[in-house]
Amino acid sequence: MIKQYLQVTKPGIIFGNLISVIGGFLLASKGSIDYPLFLFTLVGVSLVVASGCVFNNYIDRDIDRKMERTKNRVLVKGLISPKMSLVYATLLGIAGFMLLWFGANPLAMWLAVMGFVVYVGVYSLYMKRHSVYGTLIGSLSGAAPPVIGYCAVTNEFDTGALILLAIFSLWQMPHSYAIAIFRFKDYQAANIPVLPVVKGISVAKNHITLYIIAFAVATLMLSLGGYAGYKYLVVAAAVSVWWLGMALRGYKAENDKVWARKLFVFSIVAITSLSVMMSVDFMVPDSHNLLTYVW
């Protein structure tokens, strides 16, 4: 039974979000780590993400039955009752929000609330099923964890937080479209209006390319703004160029499914690399940096 309650929280998604939380937290800490704050932030975000995932599993249990990838999920198979999943999700959420409020700061908690509401209330309940723009809206919730980590330290939403929001939101788009391409039949069967299904894979490839270019620009802003160093800059540039090259090769791909899966895998490598580099190659912002004038 414990295994089922763990599975319904989507541990893989929690782990991926924790990497970005750590990146944002350590970027803001700049070598001076408040370990109790670090622990409260990690556990708090983990619980909120887990809660969102359980609510998502509850909401999506009808369409999950139609998709090969999700047909064996805990709620679909009836291993946990829908009522118990709602209670479980609610308790996880309350615990997570309380930890962020008392262990971090109110700003971190409210950012978590906004991310949660967007993911569960806007994306899962409506946009995912009714709009081709669901992925775009959902990307905002996916970008919340690193911003929460950052603001847990700074206790303010500054330019650095805005750049992180842009980086991780833009990253979500090609990442999600790649999944939709190599899982095309699943989304089609479940009648989910993702871009590749609604507009076609060729249109999705154009969007992927444009979003990766925008992502590349956003990643450089951390260094240009004086938040991250040149080692981060080199890695960010290299990762972006390689990812863009993979996207461009998609126009000549003989097998879109294989190409999209490779693009998806590298997207994880890309965002993990950036999270690690911003954790170790941070800088104290100069009051006369470039973004002072831009923003």
From Swiss-Prot:
Specify the pathway: Porphyrin-containing compound metabolism; heme O biosynthesis; heme O from protoheme: step 1/1
The record's catalysed reaction(s) read: heme b + (2E,6E)-farnesyl diphosphate + H2O = Fe(II)-heme o + diphosphate
Where in the cell is the protein located? Cell inner membrane
- Which one GO biological process term can you cite for this protein? heme O biosynthetic process
Work out whether the entry's keyword set contains Transmembrane helix.
yes
Task: Write the Enzyme Commission number(s) for this entry.
Answer: 2.5.1.141
**Where does the UniProt entry say this protein principally localizes?**
membrane
CDD domains this protein is in?
Answer: PT_UbiA_Cox10 (cd13957)
| Stretches that traverse the bilayer | 8-28, 35-55, 74-94, 106-125, 132-152, 162-182, 208-228, 233-253, 264-284
Recorded GO cellular component terms are: plasma membrane
Sorted keywords for this record are: Cell inner membrane, Cell membrane, Heme biosynthesis, Membrane, Transferase, Transmembrane, Transmembrane helix
Q: How does it sit in the membrane?
A: Multi-pass membrane protein
* MF (Gene Ontology): protoheme IX farnesyltransferase activity
A Pfam family matched by this chain, by name? UbiA
Q: Supply the enzyme class, top level.
A: transferase
Q: Which domain of life is it from?
A: Bacteria
The record's HAMAP family line, in alphabetical order, gives:
CyoE_CtaB (MF_00154)
Functional note? Converts heme B (protoheme IX) to heme O by substitution of the vinyl group on carbon 2 of heme B porphyrin ring with a hydroxyethyl farnesyl side group.
Q: Which PANTHER family match?
A: PROTOHEME IX FARNESYLTRANSFERASE, MITOCHONDRIAL
- Share any extra remarks: Carbon 2 of the heme B porphyrin ring is defined according to the Fischer nomenclature.
| Record family assignment | Belongs to the UbiA prenyltransferase family. Protoheme IX farnesyltransferase subfamily.
Can you name this protein?
Answer: Protoheme IX farnesyltransferase
* Gene name linked to the record: cyoE
